[in-house]
Amino acid sequence: PDRPDRAEVGVRVHGSRLPRRQIEDLDGLPVTSVARSAVDVARGRSIEDAVVVLDSAARVLAVRAGVELRRLRHDEDLRASCAEHARAELWAAYRAVRRWPFTVVVRSAIPLLDPASESPLESRSRIRVMSSELPTPRIAVPVVGASGTTYYADFVWDEWRVIGEADGTAKYGEDPVSVRTRLR
């Protein structure tokens, strides 16, 4: 009677048996695998939220495979390979829960993941562009600036000579001066 209902404190409890391959050891503590955790978190979310979660999981899986995150933006073959590996892991986790409620969004989001996405804002922007009537942009495109420095544009529409960037406080920090300086 004195114990609050878990729903009141914002906790959702999902009880089920886990396949052994979806359990990992973290400092002696059994935890769900990255893929299973991502699938569980993405269930019942919006497509944008689900893709944010799956992009993050794909990056974690890439790092665990020894990939330097910087290379994901620069090496298209590596990026494709990491995406394929992440999708395989996530599909395996999805199959264990495919008959559960709220899994349709996971099935829709897995093909959209991109391990090179650097922030939730970038993931959300990519999904919004994909769901708009805009042509599909090239993603993470090297662009050489006037100084000769190479930058990587989040989105490029060559036919319009337009670059799209999805940057915010996650990249530049909360300090308004730093944000203004970086955006100049």
Regions found by a protein language model. Give the residues of each.
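Short gly/ser-rich loop at a beta-strand->alpha-helix junction or flexible surface loop bordering the NTP-binding
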Residues: 1-102
